[in-house]
Amino acid sequence: MTELSGIITIVFIIYFMIMLGIGWIASRQTRSPLDFFLADRSLKAWVTAISSTASSESAWAVLGTVGLSYTEGLSAIWFLPGCLMGYLINWFFIAEKIRKQSKEIKAVTLSDYIENHFNDEKHVLRLISVVIIFSCMMAYVGAQLTAIGKTFDAIFGVPHILSISIGGMLVLGYTMMGGVRAVAWTDFIQGLIMVFGLVVVSLMAVQSLGGLSSMLVEVEQASPTTLEWMGGKSIAAFFGSMVGLLGIGLGYPGQPHVVTRYMAAKNTQVIKNGTWIALGWGLLIYSSAILLGICGQVLFPGLEDPEHLFPKAAEQLLPTPLTAIVLIGVLSAIMSTISSQILVAASTVAHDIYSKMLKQSLSHQRIIFVSRLTVLFLGLGAILIALGETRVIFWFVLFAWSGLGASFGPLILFTLYWKETSRQGAIAGMFTGFVITLVWKITGLSDSVVYELVPAFLLSSLAIYFVSKATKKNIKTPKT
């Protein structure tokens, strides 16, 4: 074992114990289903802001964006306004309103909110939303577990199967114990580690090249197109790429594991304060990723896998103990998303199906037990998926973000801002968003025309509007 791997092992064991300790503490405060799924609507500004943003990004924030910037150069900057636009939509137009309305109609999950808003006594909206959430989340979690297995393998040299099992059981441990309270607290810590790692490594990269001015000169010499705003592309190719990158932001309003975090906020002041914390976190994460990717053209020319740039730069530029902490940040990015997604997937079974659709009348403690059991079984199922055939999973996860974003994003916005939205319009919107995402991806239009989320989001919105107009006489008053 090398000095670095030995220190990383020690740091990880400490990290492992802290995560489980948080789960145990949170479990002692979990007394009802509302506690388990929404932390009794008690989350404060810093936890709400950073946990929601960290859980939305996964390893893409610390590996994918750095790799994209390395490959595309300065032209990759167009994903920054796209992502920040998503943050702005969520925090300025959704967070405060959905927290207030979800509390008024006693909604615990996103499916709850949609069904109760339209007073859908036939449970059609709940069933559709459960199918979409469950199918996307399970594939998403399976893919994330595969990623965490590869990360363990690369850092510790642990076999792939054992890596997935260790990483998966750690996440399941604290998620089962403390529910969303444990998930939010751990996501908060993991989000801080993520931003610390990216900021430190990017600044050290600039310093190693002699400062910003010297860095720009060296990058220009190493790769002249890296600092071009259009990345050397034709106007048509650049426009298509820019629209796709900007379109990423359309996915944020429809992510259930993010939206439910707003529902768990303590009050409206938490949302107002959290807005600026979340925007600051996002700006630091993505600007640092772009900066590091550009520096990578000089530090690691001809890198075979651009997504390896972040850990390679950390190992080369930082002292060994700090490198260990930064590499744990990669695991943190993945784990923060897995825990949130597995909890949302579990809520579709334990709360939406078992408690609501099957009408099982149980005590609070019994429902919590069923919820924890569901987390365990779904988590084990995701681990088995990750251990099996992964090519299908990774293909599916490419449009899982789009599928969730297009299915729920437009509908959430319509329910909050247009009173004429009907139950039939909601059904049409969710169905259209998911199907268009799937068809667009399968037919290859995402590569040849534009990112699938853009047309799927637009067509879902149109479906909600026109079907609602045609069925406006059937609008029901929301439950309270």
Positions of predicted regions on the chain:
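Membrane-embedded helix-loop-helix hairpins and adjacent transmembrane boundary segments
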Residues: 1-480
